Amino acid sequence: MEGRANSPGEPRAWPTRSVLCRGCVEPLVFLANFALVLQGPVTTQYLWHRFSADLGYNGTRHRDSCSNHSVDPIAQEVETLTSHWTLYMNVGGFLVGLFSSTLLGAWSDCVGRRPLLVLASLGLLLQTVLSIFVVQLHLHIGYLVLGRILCALLGDFSGLLAASFASVADVSSSRTRTIRMALLEACIGVAGMLASFIGGFLLQEQVYVNPFWLALAVLTVMTLYAAFCFGETVKERTPTRLFTLRHHRSVIQLYVTQAPEKSRKHLALYSLAIFVMITVHLGAQDILTLYELSAPLCWDSRLISYGSAAQQLPYLTSLLGLRLLQYCLADTWVAEIGLVFNILGMMVFAFATITPLMFTGYGLLFLSLVVTPIIRAKLSRLVRQSEQGALFSALACVNGLAMLMASGIFNSLYPATLNLMKGFPFLLAAGLLFIPAILMGILERDNHCPEFQEFSQSP
């Protein structure tokens, strides 16, 4: 890690910090996503019922009234307010996260992954505490935005993912990296399914604070694990200032430093492909709960929890599908198959007016998440071992930008098209997915130059 130290000569390494055990990073991702999925649909439903109460709208809708397709102007205003406040939270998180993710991710290349994991865990913990205050004390909704901003300042879930994926890249070989990344994403899915079922039962009586208390307990355990049990994967660590432009420069240099053209071209185009994938995934996720709450579906908390669990299931089925398909297909063609099923699922959502059709759409997404671990593994092979943190912090930035675009497009488009075609945002999502499909096909055709397949594992 030459050039990282503050003084010339051989860098001064930090002494190895004693930990209770040398735990892997997967439990952190599992616990973090468990807490987030537990809170996500609950926050949307809380906003819905909070605005319903403020506007005098009867939120307890019956099945027979849901079959009536006439538009209630008050219900439409509730949907619009819920969608817009979701947008405000995501925009606030992005604007702060754009600065903090790049700073903290590149910093972790020097000081190790643990400090970033601890900071991100504390940020998620703080956000949950503020959410509890809002629900318990009936505070202004703006405090939810404040919690989102404070969480982003400390790294947020995207920073935790950046450190986690970089940690996997630190210890995995080029051959096993794709499946290790998929395994990490599978932890996200299993945690999401479990949290969805538990969240549905906790919300039976619409006591919104209960899931937040459980999330607080989970995040407390996660923070302690990150601080005392995680086994550091960066072997040579050097004391480095946090607030310095060097960290941002190291991220920019990944894309602009003079290097063999093909390597940097692939870096940029794969980043674009994963940007579109995340935009579609997060955009659809943002409006699905709202789509299911309103007519003609009118799902209750139990059905929403089942739908949220089905939304997480592709993390697990994609891991199994990837493992099986790798025996007979190259990674790129596995990704193309996943994109086809993703497109089909979005098209079914667009025209779903009954519950069985919605679950058919969820079923078609069973291979939809093979794409992102494949792209992450390909990107990881394009940079040096000492640049893994910078790379995944750049991807965290891409994730934040995708979240902003997803919120801006889908949360604005959804209320705007309620009177025309309610499922139009899902049709747009299906169309956008052709972009990564085309990009990956082009890059695969041009991907046979051996010198860019793998850097040495040692710096």
Swiss-Prot record:
Record InterPro entries: MFS, MFS_dom, MFS_trans_sf, Sugar_transporter_CS
Annotated positions of the Phosphoserine modification: S458
Cellular localization per UniProt: Cell membrane; Apical cell membrane; Basolateral cell membrane; Endosome membrane
Transport found in the keyword field: yes
Pfam families cross-referenced by the UniProt entry: MFS_1
Subunit structure: Monomer.
Protein name per the record: Proton-coupled folate transporter
